[in-house]
């Protein structure tokens, strides 16, 4: 994903714009220097492969709890905090946990329409002639 963003940034900077007041880099040398500086600055970011390797390592080797808290103090659906969690890993895991849950079936079906549809059901309930 980061590679796609880098390719897009390089293509965006390399294509000269027709407008005179644009901020596009004028020469390919400037564009190459900019991309090199960009890569040097963001080279140390965590990528997807590192995240997968880190999650695989944590699943393979269980670590003892050093925080003094017992496992019984936590419900089964809550992860026990470990001290060596990477900040990126915690951030991504929290983002996945905070996703909206699936919509209930009622939201997918719409209003309860009853026997004869919504309008006729309201008329029937007022007059006592429901189904």
UniProtKB/Swiss-Prot annotation:
Coiled coil (UniProt feature): none
One MF annotation (Gene Ontology) recorded for this entry: hormone activity
PROSITE patterns: NATRIURETIC_PEPTIDE (PS00263)
Keyword list, A-Z: Cleavage on pair of basic residues, Disulfide bond, Hormone, Secreted, Signal, Vasoactive
Cysteine pairings via disulfide bonds: 115-131
Main location group: secreted
Cited InterPro entries: C_natriurtcpep (IPR002406), Natr_peptide (IPR000663), Natr_peptide_CS (IPR030480)
Record's signal peptide: 1-20
One Gene Ontology term, aspect cellular component: extracellular region
Cellular localization per UniProt: Secreted
Pro-peptide positions on chain: 21-109
Entry's Gene Ontology BP terms: blood vessel diameter maintenance; cGMP biosynthetic process; receptor guanylyl cyclase signaling pathway
Tissue specificity as recorded in UniProt: Highly expressed in brain and liver, and moderately in gut, gills and heart. Expressed to a low level in atrium, ventricle and liver of fresh water eels.
Family statement: Belongs to the natriuretic peptide family.
Function: Hormone which plays a role in endochondral ossification through regulation of cartilaginous growth plate chondrocytes proliferation and differentiation. May also be vasoactive and natriuretic. May be important for freshwater adaptation.
Name of this chain's protein: C-type natriuretic peptide
Organism, scientific name: Anguilla japonica (Japanese eel)
Annotated gene: cnp
């Amino acid at each position: 994903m980061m590679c796609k963003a880098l390719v897009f940034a390089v293509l965006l900077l390399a294509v000269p714009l027709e407008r005179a007041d644009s901020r596009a880099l004028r020469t390919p040398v400037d564009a190459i220097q900019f991309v090199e500086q960009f890569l040097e600055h963001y080279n140390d970011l965590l990528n997807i492969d590192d995240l997968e390797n880190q999650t695989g390592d944590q699943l393979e080797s269980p670590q003892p709890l050093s925080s003094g808290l017992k496992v019984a103090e936590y419900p089964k659906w809550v992860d026990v905090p470990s001290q060596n969690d990477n900040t990126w890993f915690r951030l991504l895991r929290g983002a996945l946990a905070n996703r909206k849950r699936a919509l209930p079936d009622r939201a997918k079906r719409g209003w309860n329409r009853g026997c004869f549809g919504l309008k006729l059901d309201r008329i029937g309930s007022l007059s006592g002639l429901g189904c």
